[in-house]
Amino acid sequence: KLPDRAPCFLSFESGIYLSNPEFCFVQLARSCSVIDLIKLGFELCGTYRIDPASSIGFRPAQPLSSTEAINRFIDKMHGKVPRKAKTAIRYVCDGSASPMETCLALLLGLPARYGGYGLGMPEMNAKVLIPARLGKRTTYRKYHCDLYWSEQNVAIEYNSREFHVNELAVERDASRINNLKAAGIEALAVTRAHVADNVKFDAIAHSAASLMGKRIRIAYVDIDERRMSLRKQLFSKDPWC
């Protein structure tokens, strides 16, 4: 029996009801791994949807839920929630704009026991103000960091282009990093090639940790196997099974 104070269904049409996004998250905790459930949470709370019909595998969309809404739903269930759901929601972030941003956040942010580098979960597409001089005045414009660790003032910008098309693209990417540095934010650029190569990505993770004033400790003797397992789960073709 479901608690009355935790509405679980949305009316689709006369006599037909669908599980709401928060209830979907809890229901799938019974069949998904923790990692797959976190990925689902990122998609529910993000601005993209997995779409096999799209040439890039996803499409822009409005968030279906939020970490606040899922946590509130879990609280109202009064213990009638799988422990896996309570574990997974701790690592879900609002605002991811793409599957690769989600994967980057999990690779870098998750604890070592799950195969991550343990840097802590970032804010996704966080808004920051970039200073710009206009005569004698300093003005500010809004800017969004793909991944941002606000306490350490460190950002990671993901460049989805495998190769730069022209010099203008190179200039634009360099400008993004320079603009963040002008705001006092240490920034690193990451490409698909970095993510695909274990050695290159390890270097990125250690660089990010250094900027944060952290050390990546090897907490498990099988850490390489844990990291490989996480990669397999993140980049599998059928993520919700």
Language model region names:
Residues 60-241:
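Surface segments flanking catalytic/ligand-binding clefts of nucleic-acid enzymes
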Residues 1-81, 112, 219-241:
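Short gly/ser-rich loop at a beta-strand->alpha-helix junction or flexible surface loop bordering the NTP-binding
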